[in-house]
Amino acid sequence: MPVVDDLIAANSRIRESARAVGEALSAVEVYTEPAIARAVQAEHNLYARIGAEFGMLSAAEAGKQMGSRSSAPRNLAAAAHRAKTLVAVRRGSYLAYPGFQFGPDGQPLPVIARLRDVAEANDWSEAGLVQWLCAPTTYFDGDRPVDHLATDPDRVVAVANEALAVSW
């Protein structure tokens, strides 16, 4: 009875999720607007999807991915982040490095530095850039920019220049 099992599993996930969100909201001592709670949850869900698809690496994992043999591989990732060749998003108390920005050789894709420059020039945060990269867009006929990072980096940068400069 796979359908019944699926429904039982879904019910369990819903209850667990509601309990966890309730506990988190209870920990906040001020009133939280529902729109804020929804936005935080949407961001959390997006990063979970990015993690499931590409990985969300800790600084140590990113450093190892880049080939560090140091006893502190996180330093290599931190240095690359400071040099603006990697993007990172805050996940709790640490920075997470989305796995999509690494090439097959483990090194940061050169396009990432160019995209960080575009984002910075348009006052976009790294989180905003990551979110834009992972969202479908009409600029790519419904594809996500992230799906073109390795195959058409110049086009991704050109589209970013146009899309990130839009003022609302």
Residue ranges and their predicted role:
Residues M1-W168:
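Non-transmembrane "mature" sequence context
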